[in-house]
């Protein structure tokens, strides 16, 4: 197979969405300009990519509270200069008091209000444990040093950007307004949310961050912060207790990996479904000449959409927390299995979802997670996707800690066979169980070429994370786009149920008409995903791009 074309070193036009940012020594790509600056400062000060990634994670908890967090969880993928790749799972866990039917209402149906908005919605947070595990194993700077910028931002405040102002005015009014502690932080005395350009300080969060910096993660899991979280839960009828917090552990796992046209792809293993299904879909696509079909062509979209259907059907049946259920990783990611699925794809006629597996109900979908990527000049690379689940999580702030808590329990299958808020159907493998981690679509991904890191990428977007990351890989490898072109190209999504091909604006009307004639049910939707990506060039320099769909994000290097 011919290797993918390398992105040009620099066009010298950094504000053009078709041209990447260029740097020689290190690069950071995040959803927030301030957090990107924090990461770069750590790199310039001699820290490595993991040091910078941990600093960014804590900074985003201050400046991007929609998804950046201490009270949530996520996944980190680390590739070291020595060529070791490790997946760090800091996904939230169901508290000990959680039961399989806890979100089933009196009518026998799943009650999404309880799994999204109430005190029962929160799982035991993992972010603080995950960041410390990464830093202890791969970092070079002390925790107090990498947390210093976040503490300063929380204590002294920062200028609210348009993205945060808009989200406070919309989602914040829903999620935060009914919780006095949260309202006191994000809304002013006159009842209005902080607006663009106004200064937002969070002294309580600064205090919590300082405790973690001084005492380590035990401050969060066994100390004063644990007391605040447990008391808040007890007050409101939540389940997280001090024993749940003390028992939480982040886990280093073997990443899922596969090959695609000569490239090695590493991504998250279960409890993320992302890595398995990205590799499964790539394995199917390897049976087709996408480059010949062409980017944005009806043939390429048809083949990719059909491959997506098969993967999402399998997701509903087989995926869950590997500590509780046996996930058939090898079978799902085998080339032989993919070939049998590829043989069922007709470029001229779509397979109705009902012929693959029964689908049901209409989903709701939004970009409510955040992803960032970091590389350094020594050959280390980090991809992180973490979240509170929906914007601002449950909206509940733990006492006087300044920490927003997640509503991640909605990612379990409250009633197997019935979609969650992202329209994703789950089976018994993802049923609620004490101590279990809910299934996720988060897919921090690193692509390796000739033994060296080539692409670091990921995205928010609920169920669309998998297909967004997939299209970044296909755009760069098959269609030979540079990292900025690949980020800007219009996206599409098919998740098996409902049986519709969701497309962004930007595709040719003739192409969409052709796809409709081939049996695809087209639905034009707003933008999908928010990739933050970095590509490493053959000479070791970097090109990067933040998604043009997102305001106030920034990729920068030095």
Locations of the language-model features?
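Noncatalytic scaffold domains of N-terminal-nucleophile
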Residues: 5-37, 41, 49-215, 220-222, ...
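Short Pro/Gly-enriched beta-strand edge/turn motifs at strand-loop
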Residues: 56-61, 238-240, 350-359, 422-432, ...
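Active-site rim segments in enzyme catalytic domains, especially the processed small/beta chain
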Residues: 62-87, 239-241, 381-449, 479, ...
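Short, small/polar residue-rich loop motifs at catalytic or cofactor-binding pockets
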Residues: 252, 366-369, 391, 440-442
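Glycine-rich phosphate/pyrophosphate-binding beta-alpha loops
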Residues: 266-275, 373, 385-396, 444, ...
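Internal maturation/activation junctions in enzymes
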Residues: 288-388, 400-401, 408, 416-417, ...
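Extended C-terminal subregions enriched in glycine
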Residues: 415, 436, 478-526
């Amino acid at each position: 197979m011919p290797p993918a074309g390398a992105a040009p070193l620099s066009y010298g036009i950094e504000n053009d969405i078709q041209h990447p940012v260029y740097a020689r020594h290190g690069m950071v790509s995040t959803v927030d300009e301030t957090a990107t600056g924090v990461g770069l400062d750590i790199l310039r000060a001699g820290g490595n990519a993991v040091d910078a990634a941990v600093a960014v994670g804590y900074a985003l908890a201050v400046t991007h509270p929609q998804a950046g967090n201490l009270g949530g969880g996520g996944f980190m993928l680390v590739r070291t200069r020595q060529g070791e790749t490790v997946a760090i799972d800091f996904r939230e866990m169901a508290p000990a008091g959680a039961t399989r039917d806890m979100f089933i209402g009196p009518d026998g149906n799943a009650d999404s209000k309880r799994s999204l908005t109430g005190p029962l919605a929160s799982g035991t947070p993992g972010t603080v444990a995950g960041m410390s595990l990464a830093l202890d194993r791969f970092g070079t700077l002390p925790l107090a040093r990498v947390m210093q910028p976040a503490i300063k931002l929380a204590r002294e405040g920062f200028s609210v950007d348009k993205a945060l102002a808009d989200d406070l005015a919309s989602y914040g009014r829903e999620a935060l307004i009914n919780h006095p502690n949260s309202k006191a932080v994000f809304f002013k005395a006159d009842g209005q949310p902080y607006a663009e350009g106004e200064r937002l300080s969070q002294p309580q969060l600064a205090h919590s961050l300082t405790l973690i910096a001084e005492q380590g993660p035990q401050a969060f899991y066994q100390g004063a912060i644990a007391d605040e979280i447990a008391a808040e839960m007890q007050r409101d009828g939540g389940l997280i207790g001090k024993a749940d917090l003390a028992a939480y552990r982040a886990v280093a796992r073997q990443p899922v990996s596969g090959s695609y046209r000569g490239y090695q792809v590493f991504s998250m293993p279960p409890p993320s479904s992302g890595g398995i299904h990205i590799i499964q879909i790539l394995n199917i696509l390897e049976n087709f000449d996408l480059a010949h079909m062409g980017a944005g062509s009806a043939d390429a979209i048809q083949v990719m959409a059909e491959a997506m259907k098969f993967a999402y059907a399998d997701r509903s049946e087989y995926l869950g927390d590997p500590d509780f259920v046996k996930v058939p990783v090898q079978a799902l990611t085998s080339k032989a299995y993919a070939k049998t699925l590829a043989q069922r794809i007709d470029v001229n006629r779509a397979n109705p979802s009902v012929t693959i597996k029964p689908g049901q109900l209409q989903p709701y979908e939004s970009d409510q997670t955040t992803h960032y990527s970091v590389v350094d000049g020594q050959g280390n690379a980090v991809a992180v996707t973490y979240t509170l689940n929906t914007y601002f999580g449950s909206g509940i702030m733990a006492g006087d800690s300044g920490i927003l808590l997640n509503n991640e329990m909605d990612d379990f299958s409250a009633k197997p066979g019935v979609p969650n808020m992202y329209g994703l159907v789950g089976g018994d493998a993802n049923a609620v169980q004490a101590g279990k981690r809910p299934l996720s679509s988060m897919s921090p991904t690193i692509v390796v070429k000739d033994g060296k890191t080539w692409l670091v990428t990921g995205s928010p977007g609920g169920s669309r994370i998998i297909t967004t990351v997939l299209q970044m890989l296909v755009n760069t490898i098959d269609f030979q786009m540079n990292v900025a072109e690949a980020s800007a190209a219009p996206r599409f999504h098919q998740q098996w149920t409902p049986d519709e091909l969701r497309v962004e604006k930007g595709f040719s009307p003739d192409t969409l008409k052709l796809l409709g004639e081939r049996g695809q049910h087209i639905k034009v939707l707003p933008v999908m995903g928010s990739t933050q990506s970095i590509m490493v060039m053959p000479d070791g320099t970097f090109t990067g791009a933040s998604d043009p769909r997102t305001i106030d994000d920034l990729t920068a290097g030095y």
